[in-house]
Amino acid sequence: MELSEPKQRFESLLSLFEDVANKRYSGDFSVKKNINAPQVPPRSYSLFNVTGGNVSSYNNQQQQQNNNNNNNNNNNNNNNNNNNNNNNNNNSGEISSNNSTPSILFSPTPTSTAPPAPPQPTTPPNTGFHNRPLSININQQPIGGVNNNNNNNNKDSPSNKPLRLSGSPPTASINGNQIEQLQRELRNEKEAHQQTKYLLNSFADENKKLSNDCQLWRAKYFKLLTKNTKLKVIFDHFQSIMNESDSVPGEGSLVHSTSYNSSSSSSSGGGGNITPRKLSLAGGGKFDDAPQSASALLKIHHQRNQSTGSAFSNTIYNGEEKTRDTISYNERPKRQTVGSSTFFPPPPSRATSTSSIQVNSDPQEIEQLTEEQYLEMLEKRRQVSLQILQTEKEYAFYLNIIVEEFLQPLKNESNLSNNPFISKAQVKQLFGDTEVILGSSKLLAEDLENVLLDGTSNPIGLGDCFLKICDYFKLYASYVKNYYTSISVLNKLKEESHKFQAFIQEKEQILLDSNFTDLGALLVLPVSRIGQYTSMINYLFSLTPQSHPDYEPFKKAVIKMKSTVDYVKEKIRDNDSQNKVRIIQNQMTGKFENLNLPHRRYVREGMLTESGKGSNSNQYYCFLFNDIFVLSTPIKKSNQFSFKKKISLSEAEVTMISDPEDRPIFQISIQNIDSQQDNSPNMLSLNGIQNAINNMTNNDSKSKNNNNNNSNGNNNNNNINSNSNSNNNSVIDIKSSGVLINNGGGSGFISNNNGITNVNSNNNNNNNINSNNNINGNNNNGNNSVNYSNGEDNNDRECFTFIADSNRDREDWIQAIHANIISSKKRNETRKPEDIEKGGIDFSVSDIKLCEQIGSGGSGCTVHRCTVDGFTCAVKVLKLKNTSPFLVEQFISEITIMVKLSHQNIAKYLGHRLSGNQLWLFMEFYPHSLKDVITKRTSPFPATEVIWMALEIAKGLEFLHTQKNPIIHRDLKPGNIMCSLDDKGRVCSIRVCDFDTSKELGNGVTLKTCIGTPCYMAAEVLNVADGGNSGYSLKADIWSFAMLCFEIISLLPPYHQFQHLQSIEMIINGTCPPLPTDLIQPKLLQPLIELLVTCIDLNPNHRPNASQLVQKLTKMLKNTGMMTE
């Protein structure tokens, strides 16, 4: 159906209704007869709802009104009904202006009983047809008569006149079905439009979702790409280490083969047509036969590395001639990228290290290369050299940032400021030799630029450049060793100094446009760069023909560089191992001796199951160090371990045995306690230490004699007895490597390589025992065991049998334990008694660095933190010049006392030495003193912590007082109690220290020297000057212990609110120091306070001794519910 005809009909209907509305306001309701107008039905039909087009009789009006709430017109009685008896009668007739009113037709609500207002002759108001609040459905054709419901009985009223409709199309031309069809089409169009809109919104949402998914996948891709690159770097590093471990290079062991050497089979035949060997690079690119562009030489991945990776990516010049310019280290290089690989790709596998570089001494080798191949080789050598120059410039640029932006301003702050937030010592610890390293980097870059940018295609002198700079690479050793200290100082300053933190944050803003986030990421650059120099030199060496003038300098540079890097790597491994020992020390709980010793190194750890009788088996988490084997049990829901047992490897043997159930079992045996000699460092004779002290006081600097190592010819040939019984069980005791055996009537040979011995045991007369990491037992009902022993009787040994996770795990454990048993025994054979007493520090070769001052001693000495071969410890330094002999003797007495002490609550003695005019005493380092903790604390300690701290101090005091010759401390106070803090800030690892005023007491000996800190001194110590006083003894420490505990409770020194003379008088009278009233948990503290009051009794005999204190404090701690060991 076409749309033009219905449209015309709509327009006609609209004009009709507009005319009717206009005539209503003008008062002219006469409608002329129109032939084309639709015929109005008789008046028996009422047009009661124009909007709906529904026509019904009056009898149906009430029902229609109930069903349709939208009908706004209520039908009333017929206008022609003048009688009250004819209310329900409907009259029919033609519509005229005398009995019909258009106001009823268009009124949205039923009309009121009041007569309508007279028509206005003026212009119709704004409430025209289109502005009236009536919703008219013009899609329906008005049919039927108009029912006038006006209640006005005046027939002559204009409102009662009949109405003639005109201007409408004929009835025959208006089809209701067509209108309804048009409506449906319009509705369909509208629905189609809404559906299209919905689809567009759906597509937009789906597009957004796909975009987010693409971003996620892109992030995952780059993450996997980063992991892949890191794994490749690790693999290349592992491959280089494996190649380096093949052999140790020497001057005469280098056999060079050029990069274009073919295989031995190719080179054996004559002729010059030899295919050049392709060199694979780390980035995925490779050198082909012809020179390639930079993009083909190396594939660069731009990745961000914030901490430990290399600083720069693998960049290469494009081979074009560069104009020579001045090196600037203040301008950022053009290419700044960060890669997780090295600055420079590692050389090929045949040239990864010095040990794998082969230099052929055949002078005819160079003649095998054609001229074209030789020139290509030199060109690639030049390209690699340009790449090294570029990366060296970038490296120097970032070093210059460290020096100019950080180091120099901090130096000025420490030197010129009246109140510096950083000291000179901290600046030195933080940056080390960065300035010297920057100078060496600039020197290398300038030398390389002078050689490479001279316009020649065959630069000569590269070998001399690296040989010259190799001596400077030794500076990296001290920097790498100091790196961990540098990072710890940096973190500590950030935490403690707001000014330093603000300074660092301000300076780090210049790194926003780089790939480094902070100063710590810059400080790691020299650590990673030193390893890259080796790859650079080795790679250039592999590209240098033997006939080239740079060959010999490069060979010397390779040897020098390898020795330097090996030393640096060894120090890095030592630092990592020592850090691991410190971590294990903090994770261990229970009663155990200090694990953190200078010579101790971490080896491995893992879970082992102890094989017990029947079904009894205990699981231990074992830690293997280079001198001890520690058994512990993991604590559930914690990263801590409970200490169980320590096995000294110098007295141990490891045994690999087979099991009928084919379980991976091995055994560790140690000498029984009854038969062991106490070789504890602090329990040895004091002759060695006393001699050392005498030498120091006499300023004797004579060198010590070398150790005499006597060896006999039977070291490598020992007998092994294999006795066979009825079950064909064979046991082989291996006492050394390379031994002959005699098994019954047969003979065989056993070889032991790398600490791993494998036994092939057969019932033949001839037995061969090879080192193949397997044990094959072909005996009937037989068990084989291999014992690593020192020839002692096994009846006096205690055995521990463990089950490993697998055979491979068992072999790894046995290999590691056996290797460290051998090294531990060798160290004990060569160490002197005084060296053992010093805790394993060899001061003659140790690298000792004095760090910041952390305190001062009572004998005129200073206390510093220091590092001994990277191991952090505390040192007391006494200057002998212009120092009274009394103070020197006091210092020596402290050393003599500390040598004898070994307890978990006593500071550990590590060693001493005489250096020039200074006497050094090395002790275990603790970061805090109890005085520092009390001063910084803002709220009182909980009662359980107070009791625990008092118990730990009492244990240390008990150890001193119960020695064979009791030791009195005489200066017990918070400043002489060292401690650590756990991750929650609670006090832990309490140690009693500072024994410069301590004294050994004999039986019945009393002291009469007034010494100590006044507010902590006992009354009898203050009265020692009186003639009637008989002196004091160990009970004076009990008084000082009470005063120390009063300060822990109140967080204030005893008698702090009184003047000095008043406090002395109160002490002499035995008055207890006042305590604050706002104590935490006073009921729990009440027993402790009562105990402390007994400790300050004026009669020393009425005071409890140290052992009684420990017993009572332990009982108090149990009553609080706090677990103790």
From Swiss-Prot:
It holds the Pfam family Pkinase. InterPro entries: DBL_dom_sf, DH_dom, FYVE_RhoGEF_PH, Kinase-like_dom_sf, PH-like_dom_sf, PH_domain, Prot_kinase_dom, Ser/Thr_kinase_AS. Its cofactor is Mg(2+). Residues 50-175, 247-287, 322-362, 693-729, 761-791 are annotated as: Disordered. SUPFAM superfamilies: DBL homology domain (DH-domain), PH domain-like, Protein kinase-like (PK-like). Its EC number is 2.7.11.1. GO terms for biological process: signal transduction. Residues 59-91, 137-161, 694-729 have a biased composition (Low complexity). Residues 848-1117 form the Protein kinase domain. The lineage of its organism: Eukaryota, Amoebozoa, Evosea, Eumycetozoa, Dictyostelia. Residues 113-124 have a biased composition (Pro residues). It catalyses: L-seryl-[protein] + ATP = O-phospho-L-seryl-[protein] + ADP + H(+); L-threonyl-[protein] + ATP = O-phospho-L-threonyl-[protein] + ADP + H(+). PANTHER family: DH DOMAIN-CONTAINING PROTEIN-RELATED, FACIOGENITAL DYSPLASIA PROTEIN. One of its GO terms (molecular function) is guanyl-nucleotide exchange factor activity. ATP binds at residues 854-862, 876. Gene3D superfamilies: Dbl homology (DH) domain, Phosphorylase Kinase, domain 1, Pleckstrin-homology domain (PH domain)/Phosphotyrosine-binding domain (PTB), Transferase(Phosphotransferase) domain 1. It comes from Dictyostelium discoideum. Keywords: ATP-binding, GTPase activation, Kinase, Magnesium, Metal-binding, Nucleotide-binding, Serine/threonine-protein kinase, Transferase. This is Kinase and exchange factor for Rac B. The active site is at residue 971. Residues 601-822 form the PH domain. Residues 92-106 have a biased composition (Polar residues). GO terms for cellular component: cytoplasm. Belongs to the protein kinase superfamily. STE Ser/Thr protein kinase family.
